[in-house]
């Protein structure tokens, strides 16, 4: 029988096991996380390149923030530890040479961007082709088994209802025998009701047992099909993990100023930490904790659950009185965020959910390392107070303002830049509706 299929309707999920209906979605989400992690790693390298041009204090702040972002993000295992090793290195380094910036942006950043473009293919309707293929594969593998599971649940419910009805019919018949006012015809009807209820019990029990047996017979094939799709997802993730390890090692080489004696020990330790990254070990961990290695409570024949249901119904009513008005929700504790020295410091895709431009230049308006006048009278840290001509710009990416003084716009929108980029990478601008606020400078381009 053809038709649309929703694996989340009509089936009770009793655990978080991979084998439960719909629980494969965590594996599918990992594909989207892989694309997101590419953005995060590019952002990480992009920020590191900027930090190469400023003082050790800013480098330390970068390391602190990114260590927290990586630890809270979806990356896991030995690759996560290898990634975090860069932050440990940054905390130990007081300053780095400016030529490192060129290698980070022109080689490593571009390599990740190109790999991401080749590995993930966007669809016109949104999402990625790789995610949809995994979703469709799991759905197809689970659909027959989920259908039989729904039949088991329905048969179990019918059987338990028949058992309950039989008990009630027997109870009525027993009570009627002690009632002298009841005529024989009424008694006969009650006896017939008992007989019919017994037949219903036998019939529903047989159907319950049959559907459960069919489910058991379908389970091996279900497991095989699900395992096959899961392994395809594992192979895709393995490519990403190995690529991340490769990129991290290349970044390490660019950062390793081996001609400076004080840096030798730092980078020797960093290389050792990265080389401990093991994709096989990470995949094995994911399999055991999020995949087929998880345990599963397979459905078993339950004879008297209807009786327990009656007791639970009463218990739930009483408990509800005590728990009315108490609601637990997921709370995003913004207070747990790491405090930043500046409200508009550069952010990661976890904080602003942003993408990054294909081109990047170190010619920043407030660059503390930019050349001054010949006399040396200009302080590179003085704020530029000269008037700025307003310029029309076009948004390259979507941006959702996170603070009251930030603008929100969509890719392709036009706005007016009112002030040049500040030292944190923000510009002041005005939307066509008159709203004035801040926005990331690298999210727009001048209109030619």
Curated annotation (Swiss-Prot):
Main localization category: cytoplasm
Post-translational modifications reported in the UniProt record: Phosphorylated on serine residues.
Domain F-BAR: 11-282
Motif segment (NPF1): 367-369
Localization per record: Cytoplasm; Cytoplasm, Cytoskeleton; Cytoplasmic vesicle membrane; Cell projection, Ruffle membrane
Keyword Metal-binding: no
PANTHER family listed in its UniProt record: PROLINE-SERINE-THREONINE PHOSPHATASE INTERACTING PROTEIN 1, PROTEIN KINASE C AND CASEIN KINASE SUBSTRATE IN NEURONS PROTEIN 2
InterPro entries: AH/BAR_dom_sf, F_BAR, FCH_dom, PACSIN1/PACSIN2_SH3, PACSIN2_F-BAR, SH3-like_dom_sf, SH3_domain
One MF annotation (Gene Ontology) recorded for this entry: cytoskeletal protein binding
Organism of origin: Gallus gallus
Residue positions of motif NPF2: 379-381
Protein name from the UniProt record: Protein kinase C and casein kinase substrate in neurons protein 2
Gene Ontology biological-process entries: actin cytoskeleton organization; caveola assembly; cytoskeleton organization; endocytosis; negative regulation of endocytosis; plasma membrane tubulation; regulation of endocytosis
One Pfam family recorded for the sequence: SH3_9
